[in-house]
Amino acid sequence: MKKIVTFLFILMIILLAATVLLHVRSCGEDLFQKTDITEKLPPIDDSLKIRIDTFLYNNFPQGSIGIELYDITADKEVYSYNKDSLMIPASCMKLLTCVTALRYIGAEKLIHNRLYTSGDIMGDTLNGNVILKTQYDTAFNRDTLNNLVNELKNKGVTYIKGNVIVDMMLTEPLDHEEHWIIGDLRTRYMGLNLQGLPRMKKEMLGALQAKGIKIIDGTITIGKLNPRNATLIADNTATLHTLVEKSLKVSSNINAETLLMPLGYIYDKKGNYRENGKKVLQNFIRNEMNINPTTVCNIDDGCGLCINDKLTADFLVKLLVYSAKRPRIYNEIINGMPLSGVDGTLYKRMHDSRLKGKLRGKTGTLTRNGGVSTLAGYFIGKDNHLIAYAILNNGWYVETSREWQDKLCLKAFMPQRIMGELKDTTHIIQE
């Protein structure tokens, strides 16, 4: 009898354990099902792909084309055509330069133009040197220089018994790259500090003479600031934000190319800043985006003037997605980009009320190689989703390509309803 009772007791324990195990397993399966991330992602707009396909079927362009759209909100590609082909990006190359500069330097970085003295001021005579130290402020002009020198005059200095030392980041003029066309870089818009030492020496002498200051027992020469033996008397500042905004909004080649200098300085303080800056762009792609740069780009400059520059539509979109996940970068990029039909290089385009103010885009234009027209940026799609897009037209007339892009954006990108305007940064996607 005792054996039967013992057997029944053991059997009950086994059945109870089995029941508990099945319950736990069931709960576990339910738990994993509920935490499946794919179920939490909002659906994409399937009609967007249909609209683009329909538009391309009826309006397929000449030349070569690369297109990609990515729903950042849903974290999913919406559409692509020829997205992995290397194509000439023109000024869309500036997106890579600006994002890299914002990542490694920051929009708030101050750019200094400073005037120092060494030695003592006795009456109206400075017994020592004046040192002008400039960085990469593209807006450094005669007014800036005169304001700095005026502070020397305010100290009561009429005579400099010593040298005027110019400490410049770039002693040679910011010149054309090998594959640019002469005139592409509009030197009349350059800062004085980018026009080389001879020009700076001439302007410095003129600024001193305008204030009635004379150099005795000395000359204007190149040299390096020794901060331990110098006193700061004047400081004019700009920010990296200004360079980024001008590069994007009005597509300034000088500002974009100048951004390579501080990047190159980070890479090697004694090397060629522009060449080293291009190496930093490649390192950014490799280290920050985890992409092999040789598969998605060829970088010959920082502004996109060179026809040897190459990017893929897929890379441009990945760059935009990278930016959207980083608020400090995204704020600068989204606000720096022209707004359709409103400002910048899109001021004269996309005036249809269904498109005006609805899209942000960096434009790119080259008249060489049969024509290059590119457009990449953001718009708000169905259900308030943030969409990143890239369109690259190569080998087709520029004006015709622009008209085609505008129609694509209007008839395919825009849903049937009028979309919300993309004027602010409320659609930041947190990383």
Where are these regions (language model features)?
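N-terminal Sec-pathway targeting helices
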Residues: 1-13, 19-21
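Beta-lactamase-like hydrolase cores
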Residues: 28-86, 148-156
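Small-residue-rich helix-loop
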Residues: 54-57, 78-80, 264-431
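Extracytoplasmic
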Residues: 62-64, 82-84, 90-93, 108-110, ...
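Soluble periplasmic/extracytoplasmic beta-strand elements of cell-envelope proteins
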Residues: 66-70, 80, 97, 129-133, ...
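Active-site SXXK
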Residues: 75, 89-108, 164, 203-205, ...
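Active-site-adjacent, His/Asp/Glu-enriched structural segments that form or flank metal-binding
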Residues: 110-169, 180-184
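A small/polar active-site loop signature that marks catalytic segments
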Residues: 159-160, 170, 182-336
